[in-house]
């Protein structure tokens, strides 16, 4: 491709509306242009990358045995009403009426459509398992679209849905999809972790997120230094720290009128934060017979709300008690709560159960207990894993310690179960001749988000550094002062024809521009291999080669250039 025949729309300045690197570079590299809030037009450079990502996804999905379909973007409301999500789904669901006053939605996801398709097409267990996928533009009416294509209203996703008659069969497909996703992200050149994840509102029995490690990520990814353990921080198991020692301090009440937070208690009384406990009060379930329940974590630890919701006595969704609700039961405010004589059920974190000689509120305003010890001063309450892990914690599998990095979720797989198939009566005839509700798995990849994540992970101060497999072009030919040098033009044209004939994707910069501008543009759009042709070097029989990722330059004999390039492509 010649730049003179190409929409080469690079920008020198960073647009003010772009706050993260991927958004900035996608705009500057001429990959996308904004149309409206959260809506983008993909220009040729961006579309070349998008098509390559989709190609890799298709190849691996086809290899897994999944079958590609194409579902409608517009979906009838009846299906959403049948599944129960017409009422459940929030304002992100774009609803409209057609000219016949019938309700429709622009699909943000496809569980209803695929379940309806399969229940119409399949009748027997002999037709299962079946795994169908498609790649489609979707729409969610995000309240605050931001970060370019990272969180846009319109986006491209790969969705797959599998159907089974047994959980064992589902597990086999789930394992295949786990491996398939790993292959996809490896081929895309991404540094990622597959992490255990909460099933959330989608439900199901198992779930993994595929997280690309990047500082701009919105999620905390936890993984071991010495094993394959990896989990979203919401699900990462926190082991008990330390061992409970002897009760060496007397229990005493201390006036603490100006210590209403853990930080103030530590500062004013020279108390190690590891010897403090904070008490968080939340609503209890109706079945428990209590209004409130107290959750205790160490002073320097954070409550994990997902874990807390899984405690039997805790109401879901988690709701913290107000100061008024707490005072009505305890007679003291939130900054003075503790486990001794607390008139509500208590659940303590594993690490709190191992503490000794610690301090906590005395359930009187302006007073704290110091020197609290379990069993001597009060019985050990119910123990649960309540906290977020912290970097340096032992890995729960006993191998290594935990590291925490930011991650961008680009894929998610679920063992979905019968949530949709049961609601929509999607059955087949089982081996026993009776109707059997199909068991489902679902598997998603945010295709456009993958591109943004790749840029977040692969860039420098000069621009994008694409992994070779998804770069818009493989080679950039930069002829210096070509329009003033017949020898440079002749060699550049011949090289361009030869590489193009070999199937190499080449961007040939034939603009009448200064060399510095040409170099900057090719580095900005992230072409991996740059060939610089200069008149003086040609006279010496040499061509300059530059590798984008390392910045390494070398001179190559011009009669060996094609062989050297071939070797570099292979490596």
UniProtKB/Swiss-Prot annotation:
Location of the protein in the cell: Cytoplasm
The protein's Enzyme Commission number: 6.1.1.15
Recorded domain comment: Consists of three domains: the N-terminal catalytic domain, the editing domain and the C-terminal anticodon-binding domain.
Gene name per UniProt: proS
Stretches of the chain forming a coiled coil according to its record: none
Main location: cytoplasm
Full protein name: Proline--tRNA ligase
Complexes and interactors: Homodimer.
């Amino acid at each position: 491709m010649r730049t003179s025949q190409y929409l080469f729309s690079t920008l020198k300045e960073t647009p003010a509306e772009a706050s993260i690197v991927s958004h900035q570079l996608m705009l500057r590299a001429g990959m996308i242009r904004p149309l409206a809030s959260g809506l983008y037009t993909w220009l040729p450079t961006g579309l070349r990358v998008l098509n390559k990502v989709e190609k890799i996804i298709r190849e691996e999905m086809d290899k897994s045995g999944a079958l590609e379909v194409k579902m409608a973007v517009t979906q009838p409301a009846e299906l959403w009403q049948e599944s129960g999500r017409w009422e459940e789904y929030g304002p992100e669901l774009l609803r409209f009426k057609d000219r016949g006053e019938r309700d429709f939605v622009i699909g943000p996801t496809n569980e209803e459509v695929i379940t309806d398709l399969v229940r119409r097409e399949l009748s027997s267990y002999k037709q299962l398992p079946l795994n169908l996928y498609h790649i489609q533009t979707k729409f969610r009416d995000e309240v605050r679209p931001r970060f370019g294509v990272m969180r846009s209203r319109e986006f491209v996703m790969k969705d797959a849905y599998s159907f089974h008659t047994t959980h064992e069969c589902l597990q086999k497909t789930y394992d295949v999809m786990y491996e398939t996703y790993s292959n996809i992200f490896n081929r895309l050149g991404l540094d990622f972790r597959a992490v255990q994840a909460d099933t959330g509102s989608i439900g199901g029995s198992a779930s993994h997120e595929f997280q690309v490690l990047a500082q701009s990520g919105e999620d905390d990814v936890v993984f071991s230094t010495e094993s394959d353990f990896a989990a979203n921080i919401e699900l990462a198991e926190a082991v008990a720290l330390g061992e409970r020692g002897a009760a060496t301090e007397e229990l005493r009440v201390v006036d603490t009128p100006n210590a209403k937070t853990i930080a103030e208690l530590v500062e004013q009384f020279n108390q190690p934060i590891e010897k403090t406990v904070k008490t968080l009060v939340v609503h209890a379930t109706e079945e428990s017979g209590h209004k409130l329940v107290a959750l205790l974590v160490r002073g320097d630890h954070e409550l994990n709300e997902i874990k807390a919701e899984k405690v039997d006595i805790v109401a879901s969704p988690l709701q913290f008690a107000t100061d008024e609700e707490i005072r009505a039961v305890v007679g003291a405010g939130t900054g003075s709560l503790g486990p001794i004589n607390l008139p509500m059920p208590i659940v303590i974190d594993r690490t709190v159960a191992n503490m000794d000689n610690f301090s906590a509120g005395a359930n009187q305003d302006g007073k704290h207990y110091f020197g609290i010890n379990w069993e001597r001063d009060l019985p050990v309450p119910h123990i649960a894993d309540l906290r977020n892990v912290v970097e340096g914690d032992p890995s729960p599998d006993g191998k290594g310690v935990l590291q925490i990095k930011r991650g961008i979720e680009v894929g998610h797989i679920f063992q979905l179960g019968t949530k949709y198939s049961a609601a929509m009566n999607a059955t087949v005839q089982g081996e026993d001749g009776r109707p059997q509700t199909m068991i489902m798995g679902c598997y998603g990849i945010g295709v456009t988000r993958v591109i943004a994540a790749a840029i977040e992970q692969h860039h420098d101060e000069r621009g994008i550094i694409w992994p070779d497999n998804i770069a818009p072009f493989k080679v950039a030919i930069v002829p210096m002062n070509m329009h003033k040098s017949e020898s440079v033009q002749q060699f550049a044209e011949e090289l361009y024809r030869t590489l193009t004939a070999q199937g190499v994707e080449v961007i040939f910069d034939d603009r009448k521009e200064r060399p510095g501008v040409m170099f900057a543009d090719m580095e900005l759009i992230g072409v991996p291999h740059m060939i610089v042709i200069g008149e003086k070097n040609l006279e010496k029989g040499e061509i300059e080669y530059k590798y984008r990722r390392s910045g390494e330059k070398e001179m190559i004999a011009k009669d060996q250039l094609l062989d050297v390039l071939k070797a570099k492509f292979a490596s």
